[in-house]
Amino acid sequence: MSPLKKEKLNKIRKELDKLDDSLIKIIKKRTNLVKRVLALKEKKNQIVDQKRIKLILKNIKKKSINHKIDPKITNKIWRNMIYAY
């Protein structure tokens, strides 16, 4: 790889690292909200709400298409987040 390409690659990687830092902060906020929801649901024995999950995934698919992102990718990401808890 040429030095110029290596420099460009490193610059892109630094941008990705910064973006990853931002994503971690957002995931932390989402995790805190999910924990609050779970605390309320545990009292009602309603941990998994399939209707809500379907609605979330439907909305994510629409938003992905609008932003020209492959909905298969975002579907996998959101499913993993949802079922991680």
Task: Identify the function of each model-found stretch.
Residues 1-85:
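Domain-level signature for soluble enzymes in the chorismate/prephenate branch of the shikimate pathway
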